[in-house]
Design a protein with these regions (language model features):
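Structured C-terminal helix/loop/strand segments within mature extracytoplasmic catalytic/sensor domains
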Residues: 103-153
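Active-site helix/loop module of the DD-peptidase/beta-lactamase fold
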Residues: 1-31, 36
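Active-site Gly/Thr loop motif
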Residues: 14-22, 66-120
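A solvent-exposed, acidic/Ser-Thr-rich amphipathic alpha-helical stretch
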Residues: 32, 58-65
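Non-transmembrane alpha-helical segments in soluble domains
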Residues: 3-4, 8, 42-49, 65, ...
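Active-site-proximal alpha-helical segments within enzyme catalytic domains
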Residues: 32-53, 107-123
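Sec/Tat-exported extracytoplasmic proteins
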Residues: 6, 10-15, 38, 45-52, ...
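Structural helix-adjacent loops and short alpha-helical linkers that scaffold large soluble proteins
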Residues: 1-4, 52-61, 77
Length: 153
């Protein structure tokens, strides 16, 4: 109900989303497993492209928005985390920061701020994570989306 009131409703999402549970009568898995349509995921991407704002209204508090796309204060094998915020993976394209969400099966919501570009990819397979912590195919999908966006311009 809270997500519907605070996020889904204001974004004008077309369909209800739902979170998976750890078992049928169990707890919601807030760390993953959000099910929604590609269009509605695209709205989340656009919300993040626009610094948490939608139609001139701040939906996600700016402080939280910024913190969520900043590396979380975590360590990975003794090294400081530089690639994950709050539900957002952090990377670079052409030395510019980007952020993206990724699903278990190759779903992506990618935000490329310096190109004013958001895209959603649904899928059934994702490549293995490379040494930088990102699936190799995310960069392939980014290249395709950038090429398509350039053709449209």
């Amino acid at each position: 109900v809270l997500v519907r009131e605070k996020i889904w409703g204001p974004l004008g999402c077309e369909h209800d989303a739902y979170w998976g549970k750890d078992r049928e009568d169990g707890d919601f898995r807030a760390f993953c497993c959000l099910y929604a349509t590609a269009r509605d995921f695209g709205r989340i991407g656009q919300l993040y492209l626009d610094s948490g704002m939608w139609n001139g209204k701040q939906i996600v508090p700016r402080e939280y928005w910024l913190a969520s796309i900043t590396p979380a204060d975590l360590e990975d094998n003794g090294k400081r985390n530089e690639r994950y915020g709050y539900f957002w993976w952090l990377a670079e394209v052409d030395s510019h920061p980007i952020h993206y969400c990724r699903g278990f099966h190759g779903e992506y919501v990618v935000v490329i701020p310096h190109e004013d570009l958001v895209f959603v990819r649904t899928g059934m397979k994702r490549e293995e994570v490379n040494t930088e912590g990102h699936p190799n195919d995310v960069y392939q999908w980014i290249a395709i989306a950038r090429e398509l966006a350039a053709r449209k311009s």
